[in-house]
């Protein structure tokens, strides 16, 4: 890892005063953002830190409203040093409050926000509602037939050219949606082995076509600076490992992880969740790059898990802790830097004291500053 310069150390030191000394702003209504509380120099340092090489902090944010008496439902309430947030639900038809909330965090804090939903088949999530509302009167035999016709999915699936054109049309529409709302990229939730199957994810070749089209506009091959992430089961795309070149990060749902050995297995040599990421992508991308791209995440949907920092976890030296802390302390056994850590339903941790206590601690563990980010 490159050494963080004095600028970044200053940024992280300033975070202490904001999180600990000026934490009252987190109780404000979302309509009163804290632009006046911190200096331009602080925010410049914060944005510079996020451009540096480091293990990132990530989260899926749900129940977003952008307003309310408390900031649990606002992006502005997320700790400043979180790098990437995937919007889980409530991502369309943005209100003025949501737009203001999103733009403040993007432009001032430098946080990047990705649209996220489960990918199964062509049309998922973005087929116009009128297609579903009018299929009978238009003479289709089923709702699915109407959806397929809208996207150009052929009745004869042996027509590979038509299949590819349909997939690319759908992927292009997702990019248009991202640009419409001003998100910073897309997080593909890919979980075909957990009941989320369809004509894209059932076939590695179709999945490759889908990602290739996205990759023209998102991810490291696009040159746009926009993000392309894949979460869920990226290790399962075994027949097309070259797909890995299109992604910025692999986000692994290492929920209720028992310890370092579990994380090493998910990354390196496989286990109960299938092959390790390196088994799938190592030859194509190299072991170091795969490791640098890997973000391990814990599930905070359960209130107890959010309040406590996850589940019991034991590191390779026999030390016991909670799982989010364990993920932050985890050093992959291959010796390379991990991509980072994160939480699902990160907003559920807002009720800790200070807010997002466990995620802040994880950030401090991975990227220590000269001062603690929170009071222990």
Question: What do the predicted segments below correspond to?
Answer:
Residues 17-21:
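C-terminal motif of bacterial Sec signal peptides marking the signal peptidase cleavage site
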Residues 1-9:
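Bacterial N-terminal signal peptides that target proteins for export
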Residues 22-376:
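Secreted glycan hydrolases and related glycan-binding modules that recognize and/or cleave
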């Amino acid at each position: 890892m490159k050494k963080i310069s004095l600028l970044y150390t200053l940024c992280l030191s300033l975070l202490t005063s904001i999180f600990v000394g000026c934490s009252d702003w987190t109780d404000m209504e979302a309509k009163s953002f804290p632009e006046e509380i911190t200096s331009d120099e602080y925010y410049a340092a914060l944005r510079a830190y996020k451009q540096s090489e480091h293990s990132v902090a990530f989260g899926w944010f749900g129940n977003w409203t952008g307003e309310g008496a408390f900031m649990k439902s606002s992006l502005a309430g997320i700790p400043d040093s979180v790098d990437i947030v995937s919007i889980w639900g409530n991502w369309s038809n943005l209100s003025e409050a949501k737009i203001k909330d999103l733009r403040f965090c993007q432009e001032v804090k430098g946080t990047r926000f990705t649209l996220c939903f489960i990918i199964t088949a062509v049309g998922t999530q973005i087929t116009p509602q009128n297609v579903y509302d009018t299929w009978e009167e238009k003479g289709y035999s089923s709702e699915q037939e109407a959806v397929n016709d809208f996207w150009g999915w052929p009745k004869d699936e042996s027509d590979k050219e038509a299949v590819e054109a349909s997939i690319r049309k759908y992927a292009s529409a997702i990019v248009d949606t991202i640009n419409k709302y001003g998100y910073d990229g897309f997080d593909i939730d890919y979980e075909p082995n957990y009941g989320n199957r369809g004509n894209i994810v059932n076939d590695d070749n179709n999945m490759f076509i889908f990602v290739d089209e996205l990759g023209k506009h998102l991810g490291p091959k696009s040159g746009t600076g926009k993000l392309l992430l894949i979460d869920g089961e990226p290790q399962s795309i075994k027949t097309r490992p070259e797909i890995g070149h299109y992604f910025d990060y692999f986000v692994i749902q290492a929920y209720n992880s028992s310890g370092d050995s579990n994380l090493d297995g998910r990354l390196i040599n496989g286990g109960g969740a299938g092959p390790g990421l390196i088994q799938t992508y190592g030859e194509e991308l190299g072991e170091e790059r795969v490791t640098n791209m890997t973000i391990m995440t814990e599930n905070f949907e359960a209130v107890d898990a959010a309040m406590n920092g996850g589940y019991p976890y034991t590191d390779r030296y026999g030390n016991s802790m909670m799982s989010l802390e364990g993920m932050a302390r985890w050093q992959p056994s291959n010796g390379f830097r991990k991509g980072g850590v994160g939480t699902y339903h990160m907003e559920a941790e807002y009720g800790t004291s200070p807010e997002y206590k466990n995620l802040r601690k994880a950030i401090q563990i991975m990227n220590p500053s000269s001062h603690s980010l929170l009071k222990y």
